[in-house]
Amino acid sequence: MQSNDMVVVVTPSYLPEQSEPNQHRYLFSYHVQVRNTSAQAAQLISRHWVITDAEQNVQEVKGLGVVGKQPLIGPGEVFEYSSGCPLPTPFGTMKGSFHFVGENGVPFDVRIDEFVLSMPQTLY
């Protein structure tokens, strides 16, 4: 199994009802879809996110699974989840990786390309 056998799509959005701009608190959600395009199952073991705000402050988040799960994703299956990210600025980015183990026992990482977290009508 190769890393390109797992396709990861992330859709971010701004949550104005949970944000407090006057207190420098901007909350974003992101929806993640992981599609297994291979002929074998793989288990998502851990995640690593690199979160950068508009002032170039970087926070790294590492942990087991996602939203408390370590899903086994079968051939042709899709696993989806949503989570959130608070920032002190109205703009930022996220990128990272997921660590998997294929049913053959071979570990591999899937890179998640950088995506933008932005309050609507905010330019940086």
Per-segment meaning from a language model:
Residues 40-59:
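Short acidic, flexible loop segments centered on an aromatic residue
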Residues 34-38:
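Asparagine-centered strand-capping/turn motif at beta-strand->loop junctions
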Residues 1-25:
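Low-complexity, acidic Ser/Thr/Pro/Gly-rich terminal tails and inter-domain linkers that flank the onset
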Residues 53-56, 68-78, 117-124:
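Short, surface-exposed linear segments at secondary-structure transitions and domain or protein termini
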Residues 59-91:
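Intrinsically disordered, low-complexity Pro/Gly/Ser/Thr-rich segments with frequent PxxP/GP/PP motifs
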Residues 25-31:
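Short, solvent-exposed loop/turn segments enriched in Ser/Thr/Gly
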Residues 86-124:
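Terminal connector regions
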Residues 6, 42, 59, 106-110:
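Short beta-strand segments
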